[in-house]
């Protein structure tokens, strides 16, 4: 029985799941918005939100903890230099999940996961 077991398995073994969320967290922190399946987005929220909370207080120990969880220097630099100060006054809820229909190949529910308060990007229109 799976009583009181939190988290989703997502049909992967534990090391594959850990590597996938490590890569997805780096992508979300780098791009500030990514498109993925809805269950993966919901699980990714559980990985990224503690990282941003960790980045609110810049210390060597916190940087090492963040690096241990992401294994990416650029991600850690952006976390502590940009995202930590940006979310300093916000007590949690750093991400937003927007449903965006179903994938054409297998009808999987898709979603955008983004960081709230991300800077607006001017859209380029084709002329």
UniProtKB/Swiss-Prot annotation:
Cited InterPro entries: Ribosomal_bL17, Ribosomal_bL17_CS, Ribosomal_bL17_sf
Highest rank taxon of the organism: Bacteria
Keywords: Ribonucleoprotein, Ribosomal protein
GO cellular component, one term: cytosolic large ribosomal subunit
GO molecular function, one term: structural constituent of ribosome
GO annotation terms (biological process): translation
SUPFAM superfamilies from the UniProt entry: Prokaryotic ribosomal protein L17 (SSF64263)
Subunit composition and interactions: Part of the 50S ribosomal subunit. Contacts protein L32.
Record family assignment: Belongs to the bacterial ribosomal protein bL17 family.
Protein name: Large ribosomal subunit protein bL17
Natural source organism: Haemophilus ducreyi (strain 35000HP / ATCC 700724)
């Amino acid at each position: 029985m799976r009583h009181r077991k939190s988290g989703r398995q997502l049909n992967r073994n534990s090391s594959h799941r850990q590597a996938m969320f490590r890569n997805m967290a780096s992508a979300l922190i780098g791009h500030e918005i990514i498109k993925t399946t809805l269950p993966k987005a919901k699980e990714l929220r559980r990985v990224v939100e503690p990282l941003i909370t960790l980045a609110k207080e810049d210390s060597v120990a916190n940087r090492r903890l963040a690096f241990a969880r992401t294994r990416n220097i650029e991600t850690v630099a952006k976390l502590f230099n940009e995202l930590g100060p940006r979310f300093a006054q916000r007590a949690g809820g750093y991400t937003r999940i927007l449903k965006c229909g179903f994938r054409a190949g297998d009808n999987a529910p898709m979603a955008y996961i983004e960081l709230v308060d991300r800077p607006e990007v001017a859209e380029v229109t084709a002329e």
